[in-house]
Regions:
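Surface-exposed, glycine-biased beta-strand/turn segments
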Residues: 104-212
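Short hydrophobic beta/alpha edge segments that flank linear recognition/processing sites
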Residues: 215-216, 244-257
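Short, cationic interaction patches enriched in Lys/Arg with P/S/T/G and frequent prolines
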Residues: 17-119, 124-128
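Active-site loop architecture of trypsin-fold serine endopeptidases
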Residues: 204-211, 253-265
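Bacterial N-terminal signal peptides
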Residues: 6-15
Length: 298
């Protein structure tokens, strides 16, 4: 069979919509790996990890400028995308200028703003506070304008192995409406929509440390983002800060990260208020699903 993922997907049974499936990984004497929903001797539970793990703490930073009058708090956004932030000050003591409620703002790409300046009420005593910064990529004020997407690959036809509300792994807010499409490693992946490349990962091999594997995130003009996951190591051909058109080559499909077989995981997300969530979309062309596979509930 051409794809191990095909074997895995065909063995899944339809469960209740709210329940997640338990998947087992079995390696036989010849080293052949099989995924199944049956607990056979020697099989191990396949542990699902959230596919979308993106560290932004090196690109969205809270900075403190100390001066004779006190402290000035600034936030810097080094991303090529807007970022919504929320700053809360806790355990405050001997401070003037503390906001009465959390400060929220949407920082433009590649920008820095001042959020607050604090001074000591009693200059002979230290100024004390604990800042808590929350943030999420994207501008929640923007609304989606497109739901139908061209196929983000060349070749095929390929088959859908897990769709919206799929019970294996499409049950988190970030991935509920994602699509998994089985395809050979090295299949050309293209941008379903044009926009700005805002995040990439290109160096991961195998399962690695990031469940997303290698990926590309593209910000569209309506604030939504298309994300392409589990890409082949070294195949990402776009860079952060590059504007691309619909249909532009971006990478080749792979089997990296939290992947059970060669496939593309494609999801559209938007910031819904300090959190990224997936949103419904359709492919502009029909994509058949594998037989006997739970592609999700309504």
């Amino acid at each position: 069979m051409p794809f191990r993922l095909t074997v895995f997907c065909a063995l899944l049974l339809v469960a209740s919509q709210a329940a997640a499936l338990t998947i087992y990984k079995y390696t036989d004497a010849n080293g052949v790996v099989t995924y199944t929903d049956q607990a056979t001797a020697g099989a191990q539970v396949f542990v699902f990890r959230d596919r979308m793990v993106e560290r932004l703490d090196n690109q969205v930073k809270l900075e403190t400028q100390k001066h004779a009058a006190g402290d000035t708090l600034l936030v810097r956004n080094d991303l090529y995308a807007p970022v919504q932030i929320e700053l809360t000050l806790e355990q405050v003591d001997n401070a003037i200028g503390v906001p009465s409620k959390p400060i929220t703002w949407v920082l433009p790409p590649r920008s820095k703003i001042r959020l607050a300046t604090l001074t000591a009420r009693d200059a002979s005593k230290p100024l004390r506070y604990t800042p808590k910064l929350r943030y999420a990529m994207g501008d929640p004020r923007l609304l989606p304008t497109q739901q139908s997407y061209p196929l983000p690959w060349r070749g095929g036809p390929f088959r859908l192995t897990q769709g919206a509300n799929g019970q294996y792994s499409h049950f988190t807010p970030k991935g509920r409406y994602a699509m998994d499409i089985a395809m050979p490693e090295g299949t050309p992946i293209v941008a379903a929509r044009g926009g700005m490349v805002v995040k990439t990962e290109n160096q991961q091999s195998g399962r690695g440390t990031n469940p997303s594997g290698n990926y590309v995130r593209i910000l569209h003009d309506d604030g939504t983002m298309g994300v392409y996951l589990h890409l082949m190591q070294g195949s990402v051909s776009v860079r952060e800060g590059q504007r691309i058109n619909s249909g532009s080559p971006i990478a080749r499909s792979g089997n990296t990260g939290n992947s059970t077989g060669p496939h593309l995981h494609f999801v559209v997300q938007r910031n819904v208020g300090l959190a990224l969530e997936s949103i419904p979309f359709d492919f502009a062309q029909p994509v058949n699903s594998l037989p006997n596979f739970a592609v999700g509930g309504e």
